[in-house]
């Protein structure tokens, strides 16, 4: 990629600090015990994990289970392992260079190409936001009976949520997000237990099947799962928020320790996200696969299935279906927090443009609400069409992903830039393989889709 102009003479200290209001604000002492160091770095991974279990993951995983049983568990496994590798690369990028991925991309691309990458990054954040709008609007409908259009409009005002929470410090944000994540996890562990999945079929789902490639329907959902699992905005987000910890920016030793514990944090939280996504697909498969409604598997279907589940009874079924809707709303609001931060990182990093957070959030959320409102009007509130829009947004994220991965790969494999923290050879091989395979699958899917129009 000839437009990359890596220059070892660039001075990182001339860069504006990423997310300056939280950068270098949380204590980390390299002389502490291993457990204290781990606790000091426990947090950024939680915010990243949110993106791996947002409403986009819910619908793609549930539909994958409803339509194709446990076949796509293998895709969730591979996506999660790939995500751990890629997020570890963003950790090293942020800590080793003092720049986030957006700053790095802008710094080492010529201006026209950097603008193109910025536009794609912004569209990816809007696509992520569409999933949050739809998930939150459906949750409001399920809990309070609020019409979808009204619910979608209400989500515009959650712009003020992060602004309020930020007043209490970044650690409080991490704690709130972590609490909501474990709430969602607990709900789905119980609900999957009630749904009585086939354990042997589940285990077989982690074995690759050729139908994933040969069946366009399965491939479409698989790309949606990949897009919902490995999300572009998370790469920008993670490379920035790991810099919130205090460590000597000039010490190789302290940077190495920071990278070590930030990576452990990331892998632990992404393992939790992996379990949640497997539970989501399992729930869809256990309730719908092999029945007359196997082509559904949307939020409303799952809500109704839980509410009318004979094994639960009327009272417990009502409680569990309500908890499902509450978890969906919590997931959407959780993603709002991380989406806001990622949007700020992308705009400031690519454009060196700093605007009030409330205005930035209002613009992004408004751009996400518009297509949802249009879809609701055109299809007269058809919930199935709205859920299809959510799946499409996740497929777009998969298509946009290489535009984040390529700069990340090129930057983290550069000796002058990364020094002793550059990618090992095996990481370069795997990351380039991921980029090539994902790009090839995207091209194939687009061609097949247009041929059937």
Swiss-Prot record:
Instruction: Give the disulfide map.
Output: none
Cellular localisation = Cell membrane
A GO MF term: manganese ion transmembrane transporter activity
**InterPro entries, sorted:** NRAMP_fam (IPR001046)
Stretches that traverse the bilayer: 39-59, 66-86, 114-134, 146-166, 175-195, 217-237, 270-290, 310-330, 362-382, 388-408, 427-447
Topological relation to the membrane, as annotated: Multi-pass membrane protein
What biological-process terms (Gene Ontology) are attached? iron ion transmembrane transport
List cellular component terms (GO): plasma membrane
UniProt keywords (A-Z) are: Cell membrane, Ion transport, Membrane, Symport, Transmembrane, Transmembrane helix, Transport
Instruction: Say which domain of life the source belongs to.
Output: Bacteria
For this chain, the family text in UniProt reads: Belongs to the NRAMP family.
Listed NCBIfam families: nramp, Nramp_1, PRK00701.1
Q: What this chain does, per the record? A: H(+)-stimulated, divalent metal cation uptake system.
Protein name (database record): Divalent metal cation transporter MntH
Species per Swiss-Prot/TrEMBL record: Staphylococcus epidermidis (strain ATCC 12228 / FDA PCI 1200)
Gene encoding this polypeptide? Answer: mntH
């Amino acid at each position: 990629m000839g437009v990359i102009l890596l220059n070892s003479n660039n001075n990182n200290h001339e860069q504006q600090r990423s997310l300056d209001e939280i950068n270098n604000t949380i204590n980390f002492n390299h002389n502490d015990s291993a457990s204290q160091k781990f606790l000091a770095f426990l947090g950024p991974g939680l915010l990243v994990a949110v993106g791996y279990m947002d409403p986009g993951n819910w619908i793609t995983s549930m539909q994958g289970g409803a339509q194709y049983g446990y076949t796509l568990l293998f895709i969730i496994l591979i996506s999660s392992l790939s995500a751990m590798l890629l997020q570890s690369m963003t950790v090293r990028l942020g800590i080793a260079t003092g720049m986030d991925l957006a700053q790095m991309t802008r710094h080492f691309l010529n201006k026209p190409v950097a603008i193109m990458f910025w536009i794609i990054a912004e569209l990816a954040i809007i696509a992520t936001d569409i999933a949050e709008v739809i998930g939150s609007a459906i949750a409001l409908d399920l809990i309070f009976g609020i019409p979808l259009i009204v619910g979608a409009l209400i989500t515009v005002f959650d712009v003020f949520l992060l602004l309020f929470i930020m007043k209490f410090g970044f650690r409080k944000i991490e704690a709130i997000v972590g609490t909501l994540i474990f709430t969602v996890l607990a709900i789905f562990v119980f609900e999957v237990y009630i749904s009585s999945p086939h354990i042997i079929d589940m285990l077989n789902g982690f074995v690759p099947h050729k139908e994933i490639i040969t069946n366009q329907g399965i491939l479409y959902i698989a790309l949606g799962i990949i897009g919902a699992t490995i999300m572009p905005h998370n790469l920008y987000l993670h490379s920035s928020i790991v810099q919130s910890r205090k460590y000597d920016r000039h010490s190789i030793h302290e940077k190495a320790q920071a990278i070590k514990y930030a990576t452990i944090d990331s892998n632990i939280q992404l393992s939790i996200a992996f379990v949640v996504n497997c539970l989501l697909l399992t729930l869809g498969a256990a309730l719908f696969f092999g029945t007359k409604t196997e082509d559904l598997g949307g939020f409303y279907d799952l809500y109704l299935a839980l509410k009318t589940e004979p094994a639960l009874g009327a009272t417990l079924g009502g409680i569990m279906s309500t908890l499902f809707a509450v978890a969906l709303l919590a997931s959407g609001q959780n993603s709002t927090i991380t989406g806001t931060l990622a949007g700020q990182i992308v705009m400031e990093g690519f454009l060196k443009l700093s605007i009030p957070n409330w205005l930035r959030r209002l613009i992004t959320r408004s751009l996400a609400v518009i297509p949802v409102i249009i879809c609701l009007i055109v299809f007269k509130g058809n919930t199935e069409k709205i859920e299809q829009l959510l799946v499409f947004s996740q497929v777009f994220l998969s298509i946009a992903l290489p535009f984040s991965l390529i700069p990340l790969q090129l930057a983290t494999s550069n000796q002058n830039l990364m020094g002793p923290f550059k990618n090992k050879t095996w990481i370069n091989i795997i990351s380039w393989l991921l980029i090539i395979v994902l790009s090839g699958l995207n091209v194939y899917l687009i061609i097949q889709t247009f041929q059937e129009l």
